[in-house]
C-alpha cells in the first residue's frame, strides 16, 4: 500500500543511459533537515529508478531481484543512491536551538519620552528575524518598567504592593502587544501569551501550546510576568525558560554586562567576562533578583547579560557568540557562528 508523502515541490531532473533512467525528485518535508552536518534547505533527493530494455531484451524483476539489469532488489544491492541516515533529530551546528530573550522595560524606552521607542522594537524585530531564519526558536519575556514599576509605586496614595504589581503586569502586556505588532509588520509570525486571561488581546499561557508555536517557527512573547504579585519579570523569564525547555536566558539591558562596581559611579569599573552563580549571590551583584538566579542555578540554565543598544548584539547573543557577561557557564563551550 503506497503511503503518500507531504510533497511541497516535485520537479524531476532526469538522467538516462542504455540501462536505466533515474529521476531525482527534490522532496521538501516540513520542519525537517535531512543532513546531520549541513543545512540543505530541508530537501532530500529521492531516486526513482526504472529499468529500460537492454541489448538482450531482458528486464529485471524489481521485487525479487531476478534479471540481469541494475534494478532495485529486495534481496541484493539497490541502485538507489545511499542517503545519510536521518533520525529526525539532526540539527545545524548552532550552540542553542531554543532561547529565551528577556527585554527590560527600560531598554524598550530608549531615548523616547513616550515610554516605548519604535526604533528599539524594530531593531529587536530585525535581529530576531535574522536568527529565526537559521532555525533557532525564540521566546521573549518583556518587562514593564518603562510604563509602571509596582515596587516603586507600592505604598503611594494608599496603593498596596499587590495592586501595584498587577498594574505592572498590565504594563508588560502593553509592551508585548507593541512588540508583536512590530514583528508581524516585517513578516515574523508572533504570538503573545499572558499569565492571566485576556482573551480579547492575547492567548492564555499554556505550556504545550507555547512549545508548539516555537516548533512551528513562531516567536512567542510571554507577558504579565508570572501572574502573581511579588515576583519580578526576571523570575518570570527564568520560570518560562525552565518550563519550555529553553537552553539559556539572554537578558538584554541598557548596560554592557555585569561590572565589578557601578560604572556610573566608578569610571574604572571592570566588565566581568563570566561568573558563577555562587559569585553572583555572594557578591550581591545586581544581575537578577535572587529568586531568578536560584531558579536558573537549580535548573542549570546559563544567563547572558548584554547591551541591547549595541547593533547586532541580540543576534550574537542568540547565536551563542561571545557578548556581555556569561553566568553559570564557560565561554569555551560557546560556538561562534558567522551565519
Swiss-Prot record:
Descriptive protein name: Uridylate kinase PUMPKIN, chloroplastic
What one GO molecular function would you report for this record? RNA binding
Q: Which reaction does it catalyse?
A: UMP + ATP = UDP + ADP
**Presence of keyword Transit peptide:** yes
| Expression induction or repression | Induced by light, detected at low levels in etiolated seedlings.
Record's subcellular location: Plastid, Chloroplast stroma
Pathway recorded for this protein: Pyrimidine metabolism; CTP biosynthesis via de novo pathway; UDP from UMP (UMPK route): step 1/1
Binding site residues for ATP = 102-105, 145, 149, 180-184, 189-191, 253, 259, 262
Positions that bind UMP:
144, 165, 226-233
> Which domain of life, per UniProt?
Eukaryota
Spell out the residue ranges making up region: Involved in allosteric activation by GTP: 110-115
What are the leading ranks of the lineage? Eukaryota, Viridiplantae, Streptophyta, Embryophyta, Tracheophyta
Q: Which organism is it from?
A: Arabidopsis thaliana (Mouse-ear cress)
Amino acid at each position: 500500500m503506497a503511503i503518500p508523502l507531504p510533497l511541497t515541490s516535485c520537479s524531476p531532473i532526469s538522467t538516462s543511459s542504455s540501462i536505466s533512467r533515474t529521476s531525482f525528485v527534490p522532496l521538501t518535508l516540513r520542519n525537517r533537515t535531512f543532513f546531520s552536518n549541513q543545512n540543505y534547505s530541508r530537501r532530500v533527493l529521492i531516486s526513482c529508478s526504472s529499468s529500460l530494455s537492454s541489448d538482450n531484451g531482458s528486464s529485471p524483476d524489481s521485487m525479487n531481484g531476478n534479471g540481469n539489469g541494475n534494478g532495485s532488489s529486495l534481496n541484493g544491492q539497490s541502485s538507489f543512491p545511499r542517503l545519510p541516515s536521518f533520525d529526525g533529530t539532526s540539527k545545524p551546528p548552532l550552540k542553542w536551538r531554543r532561547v529565551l530573550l528577556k527585554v527590560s522595560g527600560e531598554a524598550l524606552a530608549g531615548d523616547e519620552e513616550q515610554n516605548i521607542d519604535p526604533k528599539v522594537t524594530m531593531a529587536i524585530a530585525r535581529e530576531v528575524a535574522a536568527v529565526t531564519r537559521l532555525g533557532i526558536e525564540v521566546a521573549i519575556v518583556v518587562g514593564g518598567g518603562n510604563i509602571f514599576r509596582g515596587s516603586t509605586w507600592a505604598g503611594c496614595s494608599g496603593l498596596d504592593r499587590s495592586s501595584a504589581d498587577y498594574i505592572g503586569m498590565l504594563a508588560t502586556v502593553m509592551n508585548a502587544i507593541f512588540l508583536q505588532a512590530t514583528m508581524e509588520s516585517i513578516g515574523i509570525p508572533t504570538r503573545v501569551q499572558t499569565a492571566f486571561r485576556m482573551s480579547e488581546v492575547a492567548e492564555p499561557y499554556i505550556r504545550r501550546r507555547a512549545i508548539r508555536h516555537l516548533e512551528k517557527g513562531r516567536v512567542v512573547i510571554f507577558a504579565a510576568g508570572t501572574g502573581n504579585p511579588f515576583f519580578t519579570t526576571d523570575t518570570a523569564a527564568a520560570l518560562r525558560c525552565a518550563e519550555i525547555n529553553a537552553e539559556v536566558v539572554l537578558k538584554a539591558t541598557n548596560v554592557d554586562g555585569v561590572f565589578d562596581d557601578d560604572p556610573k559611579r566608578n569610571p574604572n569599573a571592570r566588565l566581568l567576562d563570566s561568573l558563577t552563580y555562587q559569585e553572583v549571590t555572594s557578591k550581591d551583584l545586581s544581575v537578577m533578583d535572587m529568586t531568578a538566579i536560584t531558579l536558573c542555578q537549580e535548573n542549570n540554565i546559563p544567563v547572558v547579560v548584554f547591551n541591547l543598544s549595541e547593533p547586532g548584539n541580540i543576534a550574537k547573543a542568540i547565536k551563542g557568540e561571545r557578548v556581555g557577561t556569561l553566568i553559570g557557564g564557560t565561554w569555551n563551550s560557546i560556538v561562534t557562528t558567522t551565519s
